[in-house]
């Protein structure tokens, strides 16, 4: 920029004729970044014409160049000064090591020095005073001479003395990375301080440490000062801010155990002394208070006696006056009250008489209404009971008649089927021999007698059962009616007596009792109805059971009929009289008795049935009367044809059912088969 300025300045100067201006080359200053070479060349003609003029102006060009060079040198000097010259602050010292030609250490205080990178190294040493707290508490508590453990905070005030030797020692012992920091000083001090504190504490008891903090601080100072000077540090002062007893004792440690014992003894002794002082003080205070209280009470008692005496006199006067006034007022009040009482008694008596009259009239009306309601309810209940009893009897009679009708119809059906079976069998038997016809007649007679006996026994049984049931039901109904009438009569008597005795206070409860009694009466009627229905159901079940017996008999005949049909010819032949046999000896032989004829087990069952006592009796009767074929035909027709309803007149008459003959001795012989 300066070269351009001078170049433009030269161009503005006037040209001299006849002089030649040489070519000038101006190189850019070191500050120019372009490094551009500026060449100023005047026109040949102009330079030649003005050559002499420039020769006269050369001193003017020399001074600016000199000024520029001087300014440039000043700037370079300032730059080098600020770059390589280091000044020590007021609270720091500089230690320069190294050199260009000679290696040496230099301590700079309140000044500066040249530091050339690569040749010199600077260490900054702070001269400020530093406070370092060393805390020993908890598990790190200090043990004293009496084996007690103490928590304490000790503050050390250290610095580096502005002395060449101490500065060089501190720089050599404590510096890191070209400086000495507070952390470096604390690291150098803490362990030395710990040893000094513990050593000084072992020389004093806990109480002495607390009472003589300055002596303890001097002891620590004397112990640590020599070690700190070896590293270039100077200990200015020690401050002990607090000393407290620690509670971190280990009872398994010998020293701690001694301390705990001493601590306990001291504490307990102090507590005892404190308690003694407190008791002594309290006794003295209480004695003084007692004396003062006695004097105060004596004075108060005298005052109270005087006051009481005066109050008694005043009260006696007031009492006399009050009694006189009260007697007068009482007399007046008594007279007024007597008049009021008489008037009130008169009004109350009239009111009571009116209320009694109204209440008696109301009670009479309610009694009449309740009596009529009770009578109506009783009459209605009796009609309902009679109606229910009549309905129950009608229902039972209808059920019994239905059962009897069913029994009669079923018996008629059985008899009709038996007659049809006998008629069909009779047409087959007539083709047999005369001996077989005689046997058939005897069998028919026996069959008729058996059927008649069975029918008679069935009719008698049914009539007896029906008569017993009817008598039982009638007895139950009569008993129910008698009990109901008796209960209603007793109830009426009780209710009338209750209504007469309890007038006003129990009218509501009487109505409730009557309602409950009505409910109980209905419940009794329902219960008796249920009993009557149960008895009727029982009769129906028994009738059904008798019908079931007849049905079971028919099922049995239906089961054995196929076997009986196949063996019927052999049976008739076996039952026929054999020539050469005397008397009425009959030999019955039934094929398959032992179950070996290939017909299975049914043959054995038939033989067992017919060989029983009743079977032999029936068989003998049928043989004597010759009605076996008739019975067989009827049974066959009954089992083959469906049941049909027939009138009772279609049954076999009683003449066809002769009495059964007594059983005769029967001998079985294999030759008669």
From Swiss-Prot:
Membrane disposition: Single-pass membrane protein
Main location: membrane
Presence of keyword Transmembrane helix: yes
Annotated stretches, region: Disordered: 639-673
InterPro entries with a match to the protein in the record: Band_7, Band_7/SPFH_dom_sf, Flotillin_C, Flotillin_fam
Gene Ontology CC, one term: plasma membrane
Keywords recorded for this protein, A-Z: Cell inner membrane, Cell membrane, Membrane, Transmembrane, Transmembrane helix
Transmembrane feature ranges: 60-80
Comp. bias intervals (Polar residues): 664-673
Listed Pfam families: Band_7, Flot
Subcellular location: Cell inner membrane; Membrane raft
Assembly with partners or alone: Homooligomerizes.
Family: Belongs to the band 7/mec-2 family. Flotillin subfamily.
PANTHER family recorded: FLOTILLIN-LIKE PROTEIN 1-RELATED, FLOTILLIN-RELATED
Function noted in UniProt: Found in functional membrane microdomains (FMM) that may be equivalent to eukaryotic membrane rafts. FMMs are highly dynamic and increase in number as cells age. Flotillins are thought to be important factors in membrane fluidity.
Protein name in UniProt: Flotillin family inner membrane protein sll1021
């Amino acid at each position: 920029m300066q070269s351009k300025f001078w170049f433009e300045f030269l161009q503005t100067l006037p040209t001299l004729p006849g002089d030649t201006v040489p070519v000038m080359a101006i190189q850019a200053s070191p500050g120019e970044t372009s490094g551009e070479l500026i060449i100023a060349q005047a026109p040949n003609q102009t330079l030649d014409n003005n050559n002499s003029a420039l020769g006269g102006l050369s001193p003017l060009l020399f001074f600016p160049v000199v000024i520029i060079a001087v300014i440039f040198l000043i700037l370079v000097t300032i730059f080098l000064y600020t770059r390589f010259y280091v000044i020590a602050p007021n609270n720091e010292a500089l230690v320069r090591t190294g050199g260009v030609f000679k290696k040496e250490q230099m301590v700079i205080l309140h000044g500066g020095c040249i530091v050339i990178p690569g040749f010199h190294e600077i260490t900054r040493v702070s001269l400020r005073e530093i406070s370092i707290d060393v805390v020993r508490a908890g598990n790190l508590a200090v043990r004293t001479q009496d084996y007690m453990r103490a928590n304490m905070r000790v503050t050390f005030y250290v610095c580096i003395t502005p002395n060449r030797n101490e500065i060089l020692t501190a720089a050599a012992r404590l510096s890191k990375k070209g400086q000495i920091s507070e952390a470096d000083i604390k690291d150098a001090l803490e362990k030395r301080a710990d040893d000094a504190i513990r050593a000084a504490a072992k020389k004093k008891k806990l109480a002495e440490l607390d009472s003589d903090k300055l002596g303890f601080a001097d002891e620590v100072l004397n112990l640590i000062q020599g070690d700190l000077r070896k590293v270039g540090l100077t200990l200015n002062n020690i401050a002990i801010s607090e000393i407290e007893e620690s509670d971190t004792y280990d009872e398994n440690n010998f020293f701690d155990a001694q301390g705990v014992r001493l601590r306990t003894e001291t504490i307990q002794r102090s507590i005892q002394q404190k308690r003694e002082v407190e008791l002594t003080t309290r006794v003295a205070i209480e004695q003084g208070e007692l004396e003062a209280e006695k004097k105060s009470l004596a004075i108060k008692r005298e005052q109270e006696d005087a006051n009481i005496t005066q109050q008694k006199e005043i009260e006696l006067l007031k009492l006399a006056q009050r009694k006189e006034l009260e007697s007068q007022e009482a007399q007046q009040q008594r007279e007024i009250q007597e008049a009021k009482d008489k008037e009130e008694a008169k009004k109350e008596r009239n009111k009571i008489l009116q209320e009694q009259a109204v209440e008696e009239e109301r009670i009479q009306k309610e009694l009449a209404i309740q009596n009529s309601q009770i009578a109506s309810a009783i009459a209605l209940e009796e009609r309902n009971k009679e109606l229910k009893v009549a309905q129950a009897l009608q229902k039972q009679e209808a059920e019994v008649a239905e059962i009897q009708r069913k029994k009669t119809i079923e018996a008629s059906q059985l008899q009709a089927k038996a007659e049809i079976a006998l008629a069909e069998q009779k047409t087959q038997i007539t083709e047999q021999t005369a001996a077989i016809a005689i046997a058939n007649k005897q069998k028919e007679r026996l069959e008729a007698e058996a059927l008649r006996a069975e029918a008679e026994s069935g009719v008698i049984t049914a009539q007896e059962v029906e008569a017993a049931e009817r008598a039982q039901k009638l007895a139950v109904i009569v008993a129910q009616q008698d009990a109901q009438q008796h209960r209603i009569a007793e109830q009426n008597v009780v209710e009338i007596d209750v209504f007469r005795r309890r007038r006003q206070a129990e009218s509501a409860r009487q109505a409730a009792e009557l309602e409950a009694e009505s409910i109980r009466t209905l419940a009794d009627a329902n219960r008796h109805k249920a009993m009557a229905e149960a008895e009727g159901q029982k009769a129906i079940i028994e009738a059904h059971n008798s019908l079931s017996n007849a049905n079971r008999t028919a099922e049995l005949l239906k089961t054995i009929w196929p076997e009986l049909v196949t063996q019927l010819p052999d049976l008739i032949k076996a039952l026929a009289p054999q020539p050469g046999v005397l008397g009425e000896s009959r030999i019955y032989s039934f094929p398959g008795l032992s179950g070996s004829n290939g017909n299975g087990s049914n043959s054995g069952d038939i033989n067992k049935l017919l060989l029983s006592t009743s079977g032999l009796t029936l068989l003998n009767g049928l043989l004597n009367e010759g009605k076996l074929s008739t019975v067989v035909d009827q049974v066959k027709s009954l089992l083959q044809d469906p049941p049909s309803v027939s009138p009772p007149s279609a049954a076999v008459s009683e003449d066809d059912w002769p009495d059964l003959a007594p059983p005769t001795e029967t001998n079985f012989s294999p030759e008669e088969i």
